[in-house]
């Protein structure tokens, strides 16, 4: 899981997405994104771990910023395959969903990625 989270963090950094895992600890500056991970399957025999990575983003003033980042992530994670230090990653974009916040100028999006990781590749 740690390798997968590090790989995704590197990808988000390269794309210029302001991101932290678990919770935002820095000074609030919009937009910002916080990630979480849910492991859905683990197989010891072939080193496979499957999961769902969720990225929650917030923006003030405009939904467009979130939609633009969603489009950027959709393209980057459309069919991302990589091998790093003996671990293979296959990540696909699943969906992006705008979620009402109840505040007039605060906007939220949840972006979901399917993750697949094989150790010892």
Where are the regions that the model predicts?
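Charged, amphipathic alpha-helical segments and their flanking helix caps
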Residues: 1-23, 27, 37-121
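Low-complexity, acidic Ser/Thr/Pro/Gly-rich terminal tails and inter-domain linkers that flank the onset
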Residues: 31-34
